[in-house]
């Protein structure tokens, strides 16, 4: 009886202590700031359990305790802080703290965990065979990046058919000049995908990823001379029709679940190691318009398919060899890279494949080739979307790409939900049978992760940022993926993304607002680690001001790339190196006597990543107008390159290390004139990257595209239309009277931003002048120059720059005072006292006075500049009127008579950018006038167009010379500390 009373007393005491502890912890958490992120809501106490028999205390957190990034420091601090609350009588009990369904130490991502990794959260097997696609012409190796890794991303929603409304609609509203369907792409396509590819990854997107509306499709089943030619040639075994159905583009549009894959045939032949048994196929496309095109091929996969099928892409810059592992990815479009092609059919426009291989007797399959993206061709409700394929939802690309209807029409009555499921299901279908999805049939592509990038709703009436949100789903089935991997590894990826953004984006005041483990189809259905990342709120003006900033996009996507890199490498327990930032201070110095140019640059340090220092560089060369070569590696921060007279050479530089390569530098050009009377220095001062003009008052907010659409990095396809509603009175509404409501007139339109390639355009005019050589440099390199007297003239490019450097202007003024000839052109210069006060008139006025006058005149010749948003050039909405000063001469006038360009002494000043002139012959004539004093319309410098080099009807086995088909090519903008030593490399043309 005494023992019973004593036991009851002890139970009572411990129960009281347990209740007391629960009360202490609950009260403590109400004011406790979780370590690591101030944006996450406070944690709550879900439950507290004291188990006397096991002598354990289990504290289960809720709210913020489920939603933060856990690392060793955070876990240690939480344990330490809660341990202090435990009464002395329970000190000997083992404490476990639960967050998001697991002990919080289990939630530490492997990439930041000390000690041994959790076996259930890392891959048991690794893919070590040939990647799906490998660029064999790449002159460098990536040893500690993502080479051999396969990543799938999707850039949000897209245009889809709403059966209830009976029409094609966006999945999200038109707000602040965009929709989520368009806007999310503007992060993923120009920034994140190139970063991952620069690290060596093979990147796949269920949704079309290229902003180009043209498309050329060539196939062995359909012969259409308007598209180009298809030729198959054999010296040994003949190409034979495969028993597997192939691609044939037999229809202009496809209804229901029709797909061109399965409508045609494919060809096959055994691989060989001997050239005398070679079999070739050539596709010679008829390119509708000169420019960059993505190149895709399709084929069939077999158990005995060759792992090293070589495709040679003949393009404007030379020939690039790409190896495809045909054991995977059969029956769909496979991306081989993006290349520059000239309009029409020529010997620089060809894709060729052979059956040459390291191993003989394996199967080589060929079918179709596709260049470009094209317009949507899937019918729903009796109509197509009328949009480019890149603007449509992923499910329609899946249908065009040969995925089964179970992937893109899983809910036939609901196109919206079917689209959501189609994205992760595409990864399962293509990845099935690989080491990462081994227990499902599929196409064997070893995808390791799937990530969906979106923007979110939510707004602030006080101009606060809503910010990003990282989402995963761990509750499906038994909590494991197809491979047996714990689904909590998706939380690791979401957690790293959360932590990376919170760390890297502090300068913008941006912090993740939470990490959610919730039931979303897009993060649930994948059989590899999958997350959704909401980058910002498209409904909140403060977020959108950041979101339109190209530098912000670059920095945010670099944070994403680094988190992906760390995550994938941690899953295989290997080290990593972060790719460098772009180089700075780029310049090209011309040495005519030795017919060489000296290229020099400096590396850019990354204060956030110690491993991101470059160890070497790759220099890319372009001859003439189109197409860079495959690049050459240089060890130092400079090199000499031999050039030939009478040809414009252009150069880009990328920084390299074991983690990959950086974004490219700006493009600089040089030229040796056979009759040079003085060398011109072109200085690129147009470095502006900026979002559109905006206003934010007590009653109104929004973006003003007509005032200034901003300058994006290269192509941009994110606008839906101009904002219509600016009043703040109806924030949060998605209706036509809601704050930010916008039009639809820009949907599907591609708009050109800053290409950083303007010295070539100016240089083409100098070449036409006939008696001047030229070279070029960045503005930052120009500021370091000391010997400007060797140049006959300086051509200063300002584009639509808004910020001007006083040091640059001082050097230009000194150059003029010493007798130098100066040409300055730009669309915003007269708004700057720095420029206006030195070279213009203080009475100069802005372009608002131009009214409806849009044309310009030089020597009675009418011409136009790019005033409006377009796909050829950045726009110049506000060119300057330049008021003449005493002794100055008007060279160019606007249509209303206002002066657009003047010359006084050795200085020519234009209130619009030279490169914005639409007519190339007028532009070249004006440049010649500025240099030599007389205006005339010279011929346009253009590429030669030649006939196709191979016609099957004129080729027989005996006359084919295989050697003629080999490679005959001649052997930033977004960030930036000089390296003390300099080494030179001599590169001959």
Segments and roles (model prediction):
Residues 796, 800-889, 895, 926:
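A glycine-rich, often tryptophan-bearing local segment used as a flexible ligand/cofactor-contacting loop or short
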Residues 191-199, 207, 381, 667-792, ...:
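Aromatic-Pro/Gly-enriched surface loop or interdomain linker
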